[in-house]
Amino acid sequence: MQHDVEHDTDAQVTDAQRAALRLANVDEATRNAALESIAAALREREAEILDANAADVSAAEAMLDRGEYTQALVDRLKLDETKIESIAEMVESVAAQEDPLGETLSARELDDDLELYRVAVPIGVVATVFESRPDALVQIAALALKSGNAVILKGGSEASESNRLLYEIVREATAAVDGVPDGWAQLIEAHEEVDRLLELDDEVDLVMPRGSSEFVSYIQDNTQIPVLGHTEGVCHVFVDGEADLSMAEEVAVDAKVQYPAVCNAVETLLVDEAVAESFLPGVVERYEAEGVELRGDERTREVVDVDPATEADWRTEYGDLELSIKVVEDVYAAMEHVNDNGSKHTESILTENPETAETFMTGVDAASVFHNASTRFADGYRYGLGAEVGISTGKIHARGPVGLEGLTTYKYYLEGDGQLVATYAGEDARPFTHREFDGEWTPGRRSER
């Protein structure tokens, strides 16, 4: 059985590798036509999707009754007509985005008729392992296709019926478009297949896990393949002593209440001691009216009646209507707390002092840092990136919400006319010019300047 799993997974990855080489040369019009075909098929097969999803939801609700699943997981699993339409529209929006491939990122003359170009290209074979949300399968497949990457998809067992059907729709819709290579998308389902996939670091170029912090940590700890993702979303809002307190209250409430289950919701509210007595009573009243369970440090509890916070609270991603509050001395104390306890995801400062804002924004270690705005804005769609494959808190390759650009890398292309390295070496070496210029790489043609 183990041999069969390894053989099957290896074969799927090999097929994806071969398809990736061909997909890298598929023109934008063909890739867009394939995406439009996916969107149309989703609408045409809506009833089938709803039936498959209903089976998943029914099984998940039984698991919920036994205490094995959470309500949040069941909620993320559900699809309806509105959601299916939004998925189709998302695919169309990906098609409408500018082509991320072939863009000349830089052009440099090394000498006459010797030009170096840095050009955006696909990564190759990307794998995604995700939990709960069946819409993630379509979203990631669409982004992979647009960016010229082959993709290996692994969804959670709780969405198995939905995932199988959605994969079938994606595969059949793109197979109907001339020029799209067969095998560019692969579906794996068994946990053993994931373990084997994570061993194939010579064949798979990138893994993108989406799920709980424990789930992402498991992926990171069990592969040598580069992993793009984040383990936690411990986000903070800092209310500075010079904040507009009315605005601060609205932002602080939005950052927690608008959608508490997502990774960009605030988990800890930091309040400058200069405004603690004037700010905390009002915002606590608002939180309590929204059903938020509050915890606070000793200084917070001197002002408002909330449960005591523990050290563990400062590093907890609640993912629910829960919030910790801490009173701090100043912006520097706030920065220290964030850097000691944050997850490098998203942080926000509320202040009318631009110098204090700059201090905070440049001093905290996070992929996104906001001034006078809710942490909930940390999202690829809201950033204008279109759909996203996830959020990366790493500092290499891609950071923050990752859209199409994050699924590309680059190659150096050198266009010459028979130049020899020997010409540029030794006592009479010809000097390089090393001049930057505006130009687009065209195969076999040097720039006309």
Q: What do the PLM-derived regions correspond to, one by one?
A:
Residues M1-L114, L143:
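N-terminal Rossmann-like NAD(P)+-binding subdomain of aldehyde/semialdehyde dehydrogenases
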Residues A19-N25, L270-V271, D320-E329, K344-I349:
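Short, well-ordered beta-strand elements within core beta-sheets of diverse protein domains
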Residues A33, G282, V331, E336-E448:
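C-terminal core of ALDH-fold dehydrogenases
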Residues R76, D80, E115, A185-V204:
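A structured beta-alpha segment of the ubiquitous adenosine-cofactor-binding alpha/beta core
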Residues E89, S93-A173, I225-V227:
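Conserved small-residue-rich beta-alpha loop and adjacent elements
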Residues E131-D135, Q139-A150, L165, I169, ...:
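ALDH superfamily catalytic-core signature
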Residues S147, D202-E203, T223, E290, ...:
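Short, structured coil segments at secondary-structure junctions
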